[in-house]
A protein has these predicted regions:
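Active-site-surrounding "flap" and adjacent substrate/cofactor-binding loops of secreted or lumenal enzymes
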Residues: 89-95
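Bacterial N-terminal signal peptides that target proteins for export
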Residues: 1-12
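An alpha-helical repeat/solenoid feature that recognizes helix-turn-helix modules
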Residues: 25-41, 52-84, 98-137, 141-348, ...
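Bacterial N-terminal signal peptides
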Residues: 10-20
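Intrinsically disordered, low-complexity peptide-like regions
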Residues: 3, 17, 23-26, 97
Length: 367
């Protein structure tokens, strides 16, 4: 998602604030009040920037508007009858296609997934109910499973694409697209025992630095974190990370080897997806991801990225951070510096970064 603007940056932050405030037992009174003030300013900013057609910027598609709707509906005083939300829902539904996708011409998976999550918040709207069912089916059809791959041969369980989802019907799968798909299927009530969840777990595990990774366990740093994708692109089946490679000593030979480094936003995305799929909390993959999170706990940057890029994806990182830890359910995280109240820390970081007009802007060039 490279086409994000000021409104989207603000909305990613607002979503995280909503998640933090929804976990009331994780916030003390001071931080609850601080969060409410930030949210009020954010909503005012949104209300003054909605387009006449009900959208908040039509590019790169209706997903941005759906993010706004999701954030607004997290507030107890706002429902689908709110005039801003009602106009936005009308716009989102106008982007529904016959095949079940919801988009404006590009980024079909991202747009459909985020719109499905938003529509799932709406009750007693027949048009939304129809769109939800069709969007679920579309996303499940987009997932790589048995369709022909780039070489024309059917994808099987041992293929690096298996279980993942990419930007479009024939797109190379990655952790980001896949986690948004899982988020949408979870939000719209799909049973976690559905084959779509189970297939996704295969792909997600193959992006993690754990012994259970049966495909790439020897090329990812075995620290429990996640890389971006199992392949570089559809023509290059080498794995890909947005971080970099590092040299470590091989655990068996003791000789130095170059391995792919894991990083923050994808690790929280993978951890969250495991929880949505209802993996056992003591599953070694879940434990490894949780331990990575504790070891690399920070809200100052997207941990694991190179120094020059460490602020890239910061607001995306905040979103996955908040959603994942909210799904985990604990109010604190064990870190090398002791227990941290993650929701309080998140509110502090967002309150400090909020602009006077209620928006947020990342100092780095990429959201």
């Amino acid at each position: 998602m490279h086409l994000m603007n000021r409104s989207v940056l603000m909305l990613l932050s607002m979503l995280v604030l909503s998640i933090a405030t929804s976990a009331a037992n994780a916030l003390d009174d001071e931080h609850w009040d601080k969060a409410q003030k930030c949210i009020a300013k954010a909503i005012t900013f949104l209300q003054t920037t909605q387009a006449d057609d009900g959208s908040w910027t039509s590019q790169p598609g209706p997903a941005i508007t759906a993010l706004v709707v999701n954030g607004m509906l997290d507030q107890p005083e706002i429902d689908a009858t709110d005039p801003y939300v009602a106009r936005a829902l009308k716009y989102i539904l106008s982007q529904c296609k016959e095949d079940g996708s919801i988009h404006g011409g590009i980024l079909q998976n991202y747009n459909t997934s985020i719109c499905l999550s938003a529509l799932s918040r709406v009750n007693n709207m027949p048009q939304a109910a129809t769109a939800i069912a069709k969007a679920q089916a579309y996303l499940k059809g987009m997932q790589w499973k048995d369709q022909p791959g780039p070489d024309g041969k059917p994808i099987t369980t041992n293929h690096p694409f298996y279980g993942g989802s990419g930007y479009g019907k024939h797109g190379r799968p990655d952790m980001s697209n896949t986690q948004f798909m899982i988020q949408a299927l979870h939000d719209s009530g799909l049973n976690c025992n559905d084959p779509a969840f189970q297939r996704a777990m295969v792909f997600i595990t193959r992006c993690q630095g754990v012994a259970q990774n049966d495909l790439l366990g020897d090329v990812i740093v075995p620290d429990g974190g996640f890389i971006y994708a199992t392949t570089t692109d559809k023509d290059n089946l080498e794995p890909s990370t947005k971080s970099d490679s590092i040299t470590v000593d091989d655990k068996d030979t003791g000789k130095p080897v170059s391995l792919l480094r894991t990083y923050g936003s994808m690790t929280y995305a993978g951890f969250k997806s495991y929880l949505y799929a209802n993996l056992d909390r003591n599953d070694p993959r879940v434990t490894a991801a949780r331990e990575w999170i504790g070891k690399h706990y920070t809200l100052d940057c997207n941990p694991g990225l190179p120094e020059a890029q460490k602020l890239q994806g910061l607001f995306y990182y905040y979103m996955t951070f908040g959603r994942a830890l909210n799904a985990w359910g604990a109010t604190t995280i064990d870190t090398p510096d002791g227990e941290r109240d993650w929701a309080n820390d998140l509110v502090d970081a967002l309150a400090k970064a909020q602009q006077k007009d209620g928006s947020w802007v990342n100092a780095a060039s990429r959201w």
